Amino acid sequence: MMEKEIVITGFDLISPIGVGQEEFWTSLRDGVSGIGCLDGTTPDSAVRPFVAAAPDFHAKDFVKPRKNIKVMSRDIQLGFVAAMMAVKRAGLNVDIESPENRSVEPERLGVIFGCDLMALELSELADAFYAGMENGKYDFSKWGPNAMTKIMPLWMLKYLPNMPASHIGIAMDARGASNSPTLDRVSSLASIIEAAHIIQRGDADVMVCGGTGNRSNPCFLSRGKSYRLAPWTGDPQSVPRPFDAGRVGTVNGEGSGALVIESKQFALARGAKPLATLRGYCQAVAPTNELLNMAESVERSITGALKKAGMSIGEIDHINADGLGTVEDDAREAAGIKAAAGDTPVFTGKGHFGTLGSGTGAVELAASLIAMEKGTLPPVRNCEKVADDCPINVITKEHTVTKNAFVKINQTNMGRSTAVVIEKY
């Protein structure tokens, strides 16, 4: 049982299927896919990478002053805007100009925001690269004197993984704890857990947490084998196929999700309306270099989170799984879920938008938070026939929510599994 109750008072997201809760849920409910081909490619292109971009998101519509965008990579833009949207949803006044109206003191407000190791935009280094060319060959001796003059002095600040949390914190004058977990797909959930620890030990009243990722960048796409991507042939909207007998790989996307969490006592005192309670959490790691034991890691993260929550699996409405859509990962995750949760219904959103890197967990968690309010959860997209090596109760038809709590889990390719238990308030 958690020593101090931690509640969620606001959340929001940016995803390939919608900007904000309303667009996202409508697309999820209607079975919309956000997956297409890389911008700039045509049917005649030699290679047409599948990606899940967020075409309806334009930072200039949200970031003020706009000049700040110059030092924000796509990852930072996504994370910053999602966080500000979540803060607004929570009714949290963080006005720097009118400190007397603030909902929380700067020293009692912190930011823990997960982020990937960001990939640069190739166009930003093009001039620098060509500055070292001579007679069709690259002269490395010219990199220092010639190329560096072609790079913006603040270029590096666009790609440091701590910058999403930095920009969010500066905008709110948050002077409390700040960190940037860089843990692949578990980054968002790890951020929520760390933020909860900070509140529980009395070092903050309110924390903004979540994650952001842009895996649709060509630099990430060039490492397709490392990320077990689906082949770039056929209909891009037919993949990923989580837990399906015909699954062939995942798809890289971009997105961000953010939550405002606070102690229940503080939230009620400021007149906020709690949406859900963080009941428990657990992180587990498979033995080094033994990914076949990933199932054990998944099982231990779920059972550990339930134990901390003081709940049984019978009280859980559904498991919001990782469901990457790859042959190996899905089978291992399914084995762990089966061992820990039996026939508990299983949902994943990756059939709609692929993997969003460090933004994955918070965006997917938002789906379950909305579902708990709506009372229904749509079927897992692209899962037409549950695979024999995934013996779990995948939601293949509309699911009616009958219980007040769910478990969200994510894993990494290095054997780490993270789980949180969330209960509707």
Question: Where do the PLM segments sit?
Answer:
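ACP-dependent fatty acid/polyketide chain-elongation machinery
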Residues: M1-N68, A90, Q265-T277, A366-R381, ...
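Condensing-enzyme catalytic core mediating Claisen C-C bond formation in acyl metabolism
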Residues: E5-T9, V32, G36-C37, D235-M311, ...
